[in-house]
């Protein structure tokens, strides 16, 4: 297998209260000499040139957070965005294992005072559905999907 790539993470504190973080990953992956029976039929084939499963070419993320004092408590907010390129989840690169690229946005805002906090949060705010995994083989194929847009409020107390 031959892999070439890099990852970049940048963090910047804009002010004492405001942080930014950016991540980027690039990956080029390919099997060079890959002799194997990928279908279970007992025949070994040359699979050189296939792309290893679950290896997206590009990934990207952005997060910003802000914290400030309000009254006797602390207000914290955070927004995150992530992108993952299309990829294939099957070792033989079966088209049924193709997973589309995805984008996702999550956010939280919370207030803490003394031992109590309340946080309003949202996951998958764009309600983008993504297949997380696909398994192909035998008589069955299956896949798992991410959670839909989910909103909530969390109340917490610590003692």
Stretch-by-stretch model annotation:
Residues 2, 100-101:
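Short, glycine/acidic-rich beta->alpha junctions
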Residues 47-53, 93-98, 140-144:
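Outer-membrane beta-barrel domain signature
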Residues 1-91, 154-158:
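Gram-negative outer-membrane beta-barrel transporters
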Residues 82-90, 111-159:
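C-terminal beta-signal and adjacent terminal beta-strands/loops
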Residues 8, 107-109:
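Short, basic/aromatic-rich helical patch in the C-terminal catalytic core of site-specific tyrosine
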Residues 57-61, 102-106, 140, 148-150:
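Transmembrane beta-barrel architecture of outer membranes
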